[in-house]
Amino acid sequence: MKNFAGVFLVLLALTVASAIAAQDKRAKEKPLVLESQGSFFVGGETKSLAAPAGARGGFGTGDITINQMYVQYQIPPNSDRHVPVVMVHGCCLSSKTWETTPDGRMGWNEYFVRKDRPVYLADQSSRARSGFDPSLFNAVRGGTTPPNQLPNILAASHQTAWSVFRFGPAFGTPFPDGQFPIEAVDELYKQMIPDLNSTLPNPNPTWTNMAALAVKLRGAILMGHSESGFFPEQAAMIDPSGVRGIISIEMPCATMTGPQVATLSKIPTLVMFGDHLDMQGGGNWAQSFDGCQKFVQQVKDAGGDAEMMHLPKLGIHGNSHMLMQDKNNLQLADLILDWIDKHVESKRRK
């Protein structure tokens, strides 16, 4: 019993020390001033749901809403001077991606707000606060659908995340020049949640909801990462009217048709990749990079404004796949903000 108590006290002390360290990192910052903050949903459709097997109480047959997208926002004073920025997370994650980093530093959402940008964080449809459609699971549980019809639910293991996010050449061994705060990697693992995108219809409702959100905001810059990295382009091909700019971070690029490229060539586009793309067993990042280079060139050849920002070519080394959480995340945010000012905001002011 004494040993258990001792272990508990050690864990408690470590937790408190971690919290204090995180607070110390934020102590010198000025108060965050907001004009408003809040949340809402975009999209959604009604669907009939049969009562689950063995349901209790009032959980009978009825209607539910599915495919909606949860959005939270923060709007700073003087925000009308800038185009809103919508940030969408990748696989097995939520909009926590953009918030406070695993080691307690400022995330991109707050930094962009402090730079007078209205920021909207979206949870992909079927993920986190957006909810998911349980009907197929209930049908299998009720015996009306065979178990082999259940979709896969992705849940990234620590080992998978380490490899795919390019933290180091082997699990537990970080790159010597790595920018991710490895001492806080356990905090990142806590952010990993089930990915139910395989339950969604095609086209993915997140694309439609992102396009609708851009229209609702009377123009927005759409930013995607990893799984959602090409979502801004997909949203623009559904309805480009509200999309003022596209920022795609570390993703596989799709092959575009001539008409699709023509649509995207009218929207300023930035693609960003980090370091160690040739890492073996880590998600075919070199192939993704090559595909995105071809995409950027396609848009440029069509007369569009597109740029590939490969950080090592800028002399910035060691960035992981989770570059918005890396130790130099604010340096990278400044690169993006500068690109926005030159390629999106400048055109808006003309």
Locate predicted features.
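Conserved alpha/beta-hydrolase
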Residues: 105-130
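Short beta-strand element of the alpha/beta-hydrolase
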Residues: 81-91
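Conserved acidic catalytic loop of the alpha/beta-hydrolase fold
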Residues: 200-221
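Catalytic active-site module of serine/aspartate enzymes centered on a nucleophile-bearing elbow/loop
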Residues: 318, 322-350
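Gly/Ala-rich beta-loop-alpha elbow adjacent to hydrolase catalytic centers
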Residues: 223-232
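The feature captures the conserved acid-bearing segment of alpha/beta-hydrolase catalytic domains
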Residues: 245-311
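Conserved alpha/beta-hydrolase fold motif
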Residues: 222-223, 246
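N-terminal cap/lid segment of alpha/beta-hydrolase-fold proteins
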Residues: 24-80
